Amino acid sequence: MSHLLRKPQANELSQGVKLVHEVKKSNSDLSYVEFKVLDLAPGSSYEESLSKQECCIVALTGKITATDHEQTFENIGTRESVFERKPTDSVYVSNDRKFGITAVTEARVALCYSPSENQLPTKLIKAEDNGIENRGKFSNKRTVHNILPDSDPSANSLLVVEVYTESGNWSSYPPHKHDQDNLPEESFLEETYYHELDPQQGFVFQRVYTDDRSIDETMTVENGNVVIVPAGYHPVGVPDGYTSYYLNVMAGPTRKWKFHNDPDHEWILER
């Protein structure tokens, strides 16, 4: 199995709290992005202290209460399945704070991390504040929910977005990359993809490759998998009959999403 592909686990952290994914610097090729997925039973709680990191708590499914012990946001979360296709609530917590999560119902939560030293206010990112975009045409159509885009100054380095791709379509396509710290032409951003499929037995294909092919991995990605993108192009293809959801987390030295298309395939934009 590719070292860029992670399968879901079910490691019990405490009563009612299971760690599904943990991508961190020490177990990946990433230097900026870290990522966790937790499953919480009703009434269970999870706490964590942040040092030189900021975190976006995304209520993927179910309802939770989140707190930084100064502000508390009760009963947040809007959906039982990501395929209800409506935005959800999230909470931004800055560095040097402690946060807690309590599950009101059965819940799945994503924790998205990046470096931060300039403490910013804790913020509830309401579902209705997510910017919704429809991108692409032909067989390259997808719907985007912007949770923490680069136009929102609420975070220091973290970018978070949800993407839905229809049956038979491609996403992150034409293949693009953001692995050069060369603004204004291109920014350096690492990235993770947390994938879900509808129906759940489906799969998508994701290729991660660089110009020199020092990275060139094509993966069969199943429901609940995570793909790590330390560098390179990273398109996703969705087979007929299935709908793709993924949660993207990006971070790098500058909080700007400026990508570069693969010149071999950029011609499709001219159709």
Curated annotation (Swiss-Prot):
<dbReference type="GO" id="GO:0019310">
    <property type="term" value="P:inositol catabolic process"/>
</dbReference>
<dbReference type="GO" id="GO:0008880">
    <property type="term" value="F:glucuronate isomerase activity"/>
</dbReference>
<dbReference type="InterPro" id="IPR011051">
    <property type="entry name" value="RmlC_Cupin_sf"/>
</dbReference>
<dbReference type="InterPro" id="IPR021120">
    <property type="entry name" value="KduI/IolB_isomerase"/>
</dbReference>
<dbReference type="InterPro" id="IPR023770">
    <property type="entry name" value="IolB_Bacilli"/>
</dbReference>
<dbReference type="GO" id="GO:0102482">
    <property type="term" value="F:5-deoxy-D-glucuronate isomerase activity"/>
</dbReference>
<dbReference type="Pfam" id="PF04962">
    <property type="entry name" value="KduI"/>
</dbReference>
<dbReference type="InterPro" id="IPR024203">
    <property type="entry name" value="Deoxy-glucuronate_isom_IolB"/>
</dbReference>
<dbReference type="InterPro" id="IPR014710">
    <property type="entry name" value="RmlC-like_jellyroll"/>
</dbReference>
<protein>
    <recommendedName>
        <fullName>5-deoxy-glucuronate isomerase</fullName>
        <ecNumber>5.3.1.30</ecNumber>
    </recommendedName>
</protein>
<keyword id="KW-0413">Isomerase</keyword>
<comment type="pathway">
    <text>Polyol metabolism; myo-inositol degradation into acetyl-CoA; acetyl-CoA from myo-inositol: step 4/7.</text>
</comment>
<comment type="similarity">
    <text>Belongs to the isomerase IolB family.</text>
</comment>
<comment type="function">
    <text>Involved in the isomerization of 5-deoxy-glucuronate (5DG) to 5-dehydro-2-deoxy-D-gluconate (DKG or 2-deoxy-5-keto-D-gluconate).</text>
</comment>
